[in-house]
Amino acid sequence: MLCGKENNVMKMMLVYVFVLITLISCVYGNVWYDYRAIKINDQRRILLSGSIHYPRSTPEMWPDIIEKAKDSQLDVIQTYVFWNGHEPSEGKYYFEGRYDLVKFIKLIHQAGLFVHLRIGPFACAEWNFGGFPVWLKYVPGIEFRTDNGPFKEKMQVFTTKIVDMMKAEKLFHWQGGPIILNQIENEYGPVEWEIGAPGKAYTHWAAQMAQSLNAGVPWIMCKQDSDVPDNVIDTCNGFYCEGFVPKDKSKPKMWTENWTGWYTEYGKPVPYRPAEDVAFSVARFIQNGGSFMNYYMFHGGTNFETTAGRFVSTSYDYDAPLDEYGLPREPKYTHLKNLHKAIKMCEPALVSSDAKVTNLGSNQEAHVYSSNSGSCAAFLANYDPKWSVKVTFSGMEFELPAWSISILPDCKKEVYNTARVNEPSPKLHSKMTPVISNLNWQSYSDEVPTADSPGTFREKKLYEQINMTWDKSDYLWYMTDVVLDGNEGFLKKGDEPWLTVNSAGHVLHVFVNGQLQGHAYGSLAKPQLTFSQKVKMTAGVNRISLLSAVVGLANVGWHFERYNQGVLGPVTLSGLNEGTRDLTWQYWSYKIGTKGEEQQVYNSGGSSHVQWGPPAWKQPLVWYKTTFDAPGGNDPLALDLGSMGKGQAWINGQSIGRHWSNNIAKGSCNDNCNYAGTYTETKCLSDCGKSSQKWYHVPRSWLQPRGNLLVVFEEWGGDTKWVSLVKRTIA
């Protein structure tokens, strides 16, 4: 009987909670959906959204960026939640500075916009380790993104943390806040297809777990393909999504990532996507019944510190409508703003019916929407990538440029065509102008440690790099000694032995007896590398010091626990009397990071711990420092590091990211790419033969009026004489 009474009490409590939530929803509004659209307060909406990632800009930049998004007629701001930024150590959370998620969402709310929160917690996003914290890799028994108990436990803890935080701050729409959508997982469909049953079980667990958190708004899964749990909305990602149809026809047609450009990888040209094609893709999606469209990215921003994914540049500009610095990219920004205005004029008709489609020619169509109240909207499309055509619609003639769509909000008058770009007058172009040059530099040469240097440890094996560093530093030293007899033939001939080092990546600097012998590096397509060349050695003890560097951790895939970096071998020395000596299994010593990192010479306190001298140019492993006063004005600032090699830079102790200016872009470029025809990330490329990135964003808010400390670490060998501070302007 006692158990029965407890059950009745529990049922009454559940009813009470349900009634309470219902009452709150009635007061503040609710979010749901039908086959046609997301419904807010029971009203169907055509929602235009843009991705802005809060850690990729500064809190001081957020209000202006959000306001420009609003001014462009967006309704929603979309962002990932970055697990490794918020929980860098297990159980120790961080929600301050650029990671102040609550502040970011409240600013969006103040601007009158909605939020789509992509909790994931896998992000991809060309972000270091896909947003996963590295400590997760070392949870016993873990396998990432599959039906694995340890992984699911940690994922649920973090997802719950975020949902509970949003509830506590009353940020969900039913609480009066801006969040109208959540996302669980990210682009998992291809992974599930690859791994089969464990992936399917994980998918359905993730959806159920998300729903159990009672966030009170719909959950989506993007790029989920065929296996879609009933309690989530499946959505599309890509350059085009007009043909996408949700698996369940009762769900709306949503596009979570319309790629406005593409990311830049070191050693490759800079991709861009013509404004006409972006506009065409949006109009085509809307005319085909789409009701939620998000630009990925609307503002890309900067990969500060070491947050960039593998071989991804520090700039995450993405050719977005707002550039890396938060300035409008013209004509893309204005062209899309005008598109949004036209679509909003059509919204009453769009949400009232399905389209009636008629052929206007061999490659032309009309999509017409109408409502019982008399509103009417038409989209006239020309899919031909080469030819403009004239079509007749409702007794009127319209000229449609190639690969374009005209929008008629009243089914009579064209107010917008995706291929007709009305640029601001006069035309606006961004440019970089030096504001401070001829800086007074000093330098400190870092140490090349050896096998018996202080702070090293020794093992008879080669260790995987991240197992040692836990990604606290990009660098790991591998050191061993080789003893050679004076009777070696190569010594008598005046020759040199051949050292071969195989590494899982990404960059290797080889020193023998303290002298640089050479470098090797991989690429995004092939991160593994092999250093193989002659090295200078003498009779007696020869000290080999290998500096292995990562350029971001992998951000795609599923078995993150298996990803390896660093020197894994084999390591061999050939050209000896004995033939080839295998060094792989002899004793190796290890040291994490550089001496300069250990001393924190990049901030004002640590800078005093080492002896600085005149600048040593074009030398490896050198730290450079200088000071400067902040230039006047409010224009965004950047460092021109085009004369440098590879390393990292800091302003007043804050890292502006990795630099790799001497990695020259290889490929075929077309600075006047034709907008018409299907776009891919390799269609339109610029800056071939130039540095993949030479300008590095310096946030204004990181500067003080006088005496700003600038520190640049150079791995390769650069020349600071040509380093300058520039301002970015639009004129």
Swiss-Prot record:
Tissues and organs where the protein is expressed, per its UniProt entry: Senescing flower petals.
GO molecular function: beta-galactosidase activity
Keyword field contains Signal: yes
Induction text: By ethylene.
Pfam families, per the entry: BetaGal_gal-bd, GHD, Glyco_hydro_35
InterPro entries: BetaGal_gal-bd (IPR048913), Galactose-bd-like_sf (IPR008979), GHD (IPR041392), Gly_Hdrlase_35_cat (IPR031330), Glyco_hydro_35_CS (IPR019801), Glycoside_Hdrlase_35 (IPR001944), Glycoside_hydrolase_SF (IPR017853)
Catalytic reaction(s) noted: Hydrolysis of terminal non-reducing beta-D-galactose residues in beta-D-galactosides
EC id: 3.2.1.23
Active site residues according to the UniProt entry: 187 (proton donor), 257 (nucleophile)
PROSITE patterns the UniProt entry points to: GLYCOSYL_HYDROL_F35 (PS01182)
Signal peptide: 1-29
Taxonomy, superkingdom: Eukaryota
An individual GO BP term: carbohydrate metabolic process
This protein's record includes keyword Hydrolase: yes
Keywords assigned by UniProt, alphabetized: Glycosidase, Hydrolase, Signal
Family: Belongs to the glycosyl hydrolase 35 family.
Protein name as it appears in the record: Putative beta-galactosidase
